[in-house]
């Protein structure tokens, strides 16, 4: 079992500011500044302890505000498309979806927008930390986890954006994003941490290939997402 423990060491004589660290990380993941014009499709296989295998195809065109999610779970397949202000849903090839199916599979436009934001955020890191409403603690932290030292940024958000507290862990040599964790209430040690392994380049962006999820509270393994193109 992976044990997520470590020591937070504020760097009083900082080698670089939090802003400089983020710049270095973005330079690593998006060396040619392609993210704002990102246009590509990729696949995510989600393996969960308590749920059946879920395979998703995600298409993003950030410049055109286009998002498409096609999901396969067992014998069922559904799609959600957001094209600017328009939303379209289908289930097993039909757009005529019963209320029962909508409720069972949580198939609605609000959910589609949530998934758009979810995939754009997680696969757009660390570039998404430049978004409006993001509050980056100016103090760079050094943290030792499982014998490895990381540079760490603490991030919170304006109330209208989000209420969670996030920590992002960067490789001390390459500045690659290696793990992150979030808390709903840090005093309760709730929330989850995510370990990133390997990389895959999608449309010029270095994205994590494997993401493994664990509870902060007891290191319980929750599942794994595997990226492919």
Residue ranges and their predicted role:
Residues 58-65, 83-86, 102-106, 198-200, ...:
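A short, sequence-level motif marking secondary-structure junctions
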Residues 14-20, 89-164, 187-190:
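Flexible, processing/modification-adjacent segments and terminal tails
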Residues 144-229:
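Gly/Pro-enriched, hydrophobic low-complexity segments
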Residues 48-55, 73-80, 94-99, 160-165, ...:
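Short, surface-exposed beta-strand/loop "edge" segments at domain boundaries and coil↔beta transitions
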Residues 27-95, 133-141:
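N-terminal mature ectodomain segment of secretory-pathway/periplasmic proteins
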Residues 1-18:
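Bacterial Sec-dependent N-terminal signal peptides
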């Amino acid at each position: 079992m992976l044990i997520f423990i470590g020591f937070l060491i504020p760097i009083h004589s900082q080698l670089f500011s939090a802003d400089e660290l983020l710049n270095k990380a973005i330079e690593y993941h998006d060396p040619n500044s392609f993210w704002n014009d990102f246009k590509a499709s990729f696949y995510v296989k989600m393996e969960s302890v308590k749920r059946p295998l879920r395979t998703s195809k995600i298409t993003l065109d950030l410049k055109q505000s286009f998002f498409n999610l096609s999901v396969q779970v067992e014998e069922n397949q559904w799609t959600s498309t957001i094209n600017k202000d328009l939303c379209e849903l289908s289930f097993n090839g039909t757009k005529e979806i019963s209320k029962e199916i909508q409720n069972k599979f949580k198939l609605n436009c609000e959910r589609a927008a949530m998934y758009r934001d979810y995939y754009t955020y997680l696969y757009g890191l660390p570039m998404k930390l430049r978004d409006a409403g993001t509050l980056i603690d100016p103090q760079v932290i050094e943290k030792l986890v499982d014998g490895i030292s990381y540079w760490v940024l603490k991030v919170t958000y304006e109330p209208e954006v989000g209420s969670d507290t996030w920590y992002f862990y960067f490789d001390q040599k390459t500045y690659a994003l290696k793990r992150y964790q979030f808390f709903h209430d840090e005093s309760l040690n709730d929330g989850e941490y995510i370990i990133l392994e390997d990389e895959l380049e999608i449309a010029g962006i270095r994205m994590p290939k494997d993401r493994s999820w664990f509870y902060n509270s007891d290191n319980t393994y929750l599942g794994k997402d595997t990226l492919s193109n």
